[in-house]
Amino acid sequence: MSTFQALMLMLAIGSFIIALLTYIEKIDLP
C-alpha cells in the first residue's frame, strides 16, 4: 500500500467518524 492510499484511507475513516458523531449529536438534541 502506498503512502497516498494510506492517507486517503485515513481521511475517509476520519470523515466517517465525524459524520457519525454529528449524526449522534443531532439525535440526542430535542
UniProtKB/Swiss-Prot annotation:
This is Small toxic protein BsrE. Encoded in the prophage-like P6 region. The chain crosses the membrane at residues 4-24. It comes from Bacillus subtilis (strain 168). It is a single-pass membrane protein. Disruption phenotype: Non-essential, it can be deleted on rich medium; the gene for the antisense antitoxin SR5 RNA can also be deleted without a visible phenotype. Toxic component of a type I toxin-antitoxin (TA) system; overexpression in the absence of cognate antisense antitoxin SR5 RNA leads to cell lysis. Base pairing occurs between the 3' UTRs of bsrE mRNA and SR5 RNA which leads to bsrE mRNA degradation initiated by RNase III (rnc) and RNase J1 (rnjA). Genetic evidence suggests an unidentified RNA-binding protein may exist that promotes TA RNA interaction. Its main location: membrane. GO terms for cellular component: plasma membrane. It comes from the Bacteria. It is found in: Cell membrane. Pfam families: Hol_Tox. Induction: Accumulates by 2 hours post-innoculation with maximal expression at 4 hours, and has disappeared by 8 hours in rich media. Slightly different results were found in another study; in rich medium, expression increased slowly over time and was maximal at 6 hours. In minimal medium without glucose expression decreased as growth progressed, while in minimal medium plus glucose expression was constant during growth. SR5 antitoxin RNA is always present at levels equal to or in excess of toxin mRNA. InterPro entries: BsrE-like. Keywords: Cell membrane, Membrane, Toxin-antitoxin system, Transmembrane, Transmembrane helix. The gene is bsrE.
